[in-house]
Design a protein with these regions (language model features):
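Metal-associated gating/positioning segment near the N- to mid-region
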Residues: 81-152, 171, 210, 236-241
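C-terminal cap of metal-dependent C-N hydrolases
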Residues: 367-369, 373, 386-430
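Active-site gating/metal-coordination segments in enzymes
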Residues: 169-214, 248, 297-302
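Active-site core of metal-dependent hydrolases
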Residues: 202-316, 340-341, 372-375, 393-396
Length: 463
């Protein structure tokens, strides 16, 4: 399906929403003074800095408080708040929603388009100034990529993939969408790029070696990077074939980790989707101790999402240990949530990195610099430096002391624009929409049947 169909639907959507979320563009000169800067390079905190933003670009980063020059500019005293590069969520599906996927699959294209945009814009308010889509039907992600780029509304940067490329009978490869053999794989990759994809997502678990090589070679010849939904032994095969990044990496082995470190392959573990009952309880106990459990609705729904994807203790332990090993080996890590809402689950993914043994600094780099490097835009994004675009997150507390201080976000800037931090009047939070769906009927039985794992931590009140 050509993405213009989704864009046509999006045109109606923008007309409905534009009155409340009009893109203004970076205007004039803004100075953020008395800022403590964590620049995303791995360098220590730069204390007492002043950041000058001219339009969309950082034009000054100097030590000391701002000294008035007589020129007209807006000066914002951050009073010691912490500034990082904008966060990236590198594994996003804009329209899917655990545990309701099966009941949302029948929704109209228009409903899916609207849900995708609301999800993306709420992610921006949580500090995620850029998203990488990793599999989306009807080119809905491309439609929103173009809508935000063209300024219809203020939203995050989207690096869209369109639909995943998978062989027939593979994961995400039904009869209508599957691509089999080298010729079909090449055509599938080219058609997605022709329709606006900036990323190619493949599912290589069931791919033959020549199909895998064809997918990577074709995308690279067109200047587009490739990421793979993969589990062992397909992880090793993909890395050996030159894949740019690995998603999930189920059953990741020491041999694959060593090869990834050697070849510079990026790893997006989506660890938040690989938790056992023990780890879910560990997470919620920790957040409660830090005072982040006051929002009963958020706690209830993020827990429901977690149990919708609960894994066995053995699986969860292996994935946690693999992430720690990858970090220690120097594999370049990426932050990706897989589940939504993008903002809350993205925060949980960053927190889960630290619970898995990754340092706070390396976690921030995985959410800022590394994504920009992978996507080839490190000259413009990913760090707080002069000459780069002003995608910034301002927090009242230091995330290097406790990663959960990312929850103290005070301001977000995208292209130098200060993002409104609350939904427009009269609109719902994403969690309000999620809550309105109610507990999904028969979800637990269906998911257990598919996974072969009996979920012990049933939050649905019986079977």
């Amino acid at each position: 399906m050509n993405h213009r169909n989704a864009l046509g639907t999006l045109g109606v959507t923008t007309a409905l929403l534009a009155s409340s979320l009009v893109w203004a563009g970076g205007q004039g000169i803004t100075v953020l003074t008395n800022a403590n800067v964590i620049d995303g390079t791995g360098a220590p905190v730069q204390e007492g800095m002043s950041i000058t933003i001219d339009g969309a670009v950082i034009t000054g980063l100097v030590a000391g408080a701002y000294a008035p020059t007589g020129e007209e500019r807006e000066v914002i005293d951050l009073a010691g708040a912490y500034v990082t590069p904008g966060f990236w969520n590198m594994h996003v599906h804009l329209t899917t929603l655990l545990p309701h996927n099966h009941q949302l699959n029948g929704a109209s294209l228009g409903a899916k388009v609207i849900r995708a945009g609301v999800n993306a814009m709420e992610g921006l308010r949580h500090g995620f100034t850029a998203l990488r889509s990793t599999g989306e039907e009807h080119y809905i992600d491309v439609a929103w990529q173009e809508a935000f780029d063209e300024g219809f509304m203020l939203g995050p940067r989207i690096f869209a993939s369109g639909e995943s490329v998978s062989p027939t009978a593979g994961h995400r490869g039904d009869v209508e969408r599957g691509a089999d053999g080298v010729a079909e794989i090449r055509k599938a990759v080219r058609s997605r790029i022709q329709n606006g994809a900036a990323v190619i997502k493949i599912v290589n678990v069931e791919m033959l070696p020549d199909e895998l090589e064809a997918a990577i070679e074709t995308a690279h010849s067109l200047g587009v990077h490739v990421t793979a939904h993969s589990r062992e032994p397909a992880v090793y095969a993909a890395v050996e074939a030159g894949i740019d990044s690995i998603e999930h990496g189920y059953g990741l082995t020491d041999e694959s980790i060593a090869l990834m470190a050697e070849k510079g392959t990026f790893y997006d573990p989506t660890i938040i989707c690989n938790l056992s009952d023990e780890y879910i309880r560990e997470r919620e106990t920790r957040l409660a101790s830090l005072g982040y459990s006051d929002d009963e609705q958020a706690v209830r729904l993020r827990t429901e999402i977690a149990y919708a994807d609960e894994r066995s203790p053995e699986h969860a332990r292996h994935q946690r240990e693999a992430l720690a090993k990858a970090a220690k080996a120097g594999v370049k890590l990426l932050v990706g949530s897989d589940s939504m809402p993008i903002g809350e689950i993205g925060w949980l993914e960053m927190e889960q990195f630290v619970l898995s043994g990754v340092s706070e600094m390396d976690t921030l780099i995985a959410a800022t610099r590394n994504p920009a490097e992978l996507l080839g835009v490190l000259d413009l994004l990913g760090t707080v430096e002069e000459g780069k675009l002003a995608d910034l997150v301002v927090m009242t507390a230091n995330p290097l002391e406790n990663i959960s201080n990312i929850r103290t976000i005070r301001m977000v800037f995208k292209d130098g624009i200060s993002v409104p931090m609350t939904p427009p009047p009269g609109t719902l939070r994403f969690y309000d929409y999620y809550d309105s769906l109610g507990p999904p009927s028969s979800f637990l039985e269906r998911s257990e049947s598919l996974s072969g794992f009996v979920r012990e931590g049933n939050p649905y009140g019986g079977r």
